Amino acid sequence: MIEPLVLGLVMGLVPITLAGLFVAAYLQYKRGNQLNLD
């Protein structure tokens, strides 16, 4: 049985982690385009 606190923590951290990775990848991609790098 999963504790509600742990479940809430995971449900809160997962979207933030995915959003952070997406933003980091987007910024790196955008920076690469500005430098004309493939």
From Swiss-Prot:
**Cross-referenced InterPro entries, in alphabetical order?**
Cyt_6/f_cplx_su5, Cyt_6/f_cplx_su5_sf
Record-annotated disulphide pairs: none
Q: Where are the transmembrane segments?
A: 5-25
Q: Which GO terms describe its cellular component?
A: cytochrome b6f complex; plasma membrane-derived thylakoid membrane
- Which keywords has UniProt assigned to this entry? Electron transport, Membrane, Photosynthesis, Thylakoid, Transmembrane, Transmembrane helix, Transport
Which molecular function terms from Gene Ontology are attached?
Answer: electron transporter, transferring electrons within cytochrome b6/f complex of photosystem II activity
Spell out the subcellular localization from the entry.
Cellular thylakoid membrane
Q: How does it sit in the membrane?
A: Single-pass membrane protein
Biological processes, Gene Ontology terms: cytochrome complex assembly; photosynthesis
Q: What does the function comment of this entry state?
A: Component of the cytochrome b6-f complex, which mediates electron transfer between photosystem II (PSII) and photosystem I (PSI), cyclic electron flow around PSI, and state transitions. PetG is required for either the stability or assembly of the cytochrome b6-f complex.
Family matches, as NCBIfam families:
PRK00665.1
Q: How does it assemble?
A: The 4 large subunits of the cytochrome b6-f complex are cytochrome b6, subunit IV (17 kDa polypeptide, PetD), cytochrome f and the Rieske protein, while the 4 small subunits are PetG, PetL, PetM and PetN. The complex functions as a dimer.
Name of protein: Cytochrome b6-f complex subunit 5
Q: Which organism is it from?
A: Gloeothece citriformis (strain PCC 7424) (Cyanothece sp. (strain PCC 7424))
What gene does the UniProt entry assign to this protein?
petG
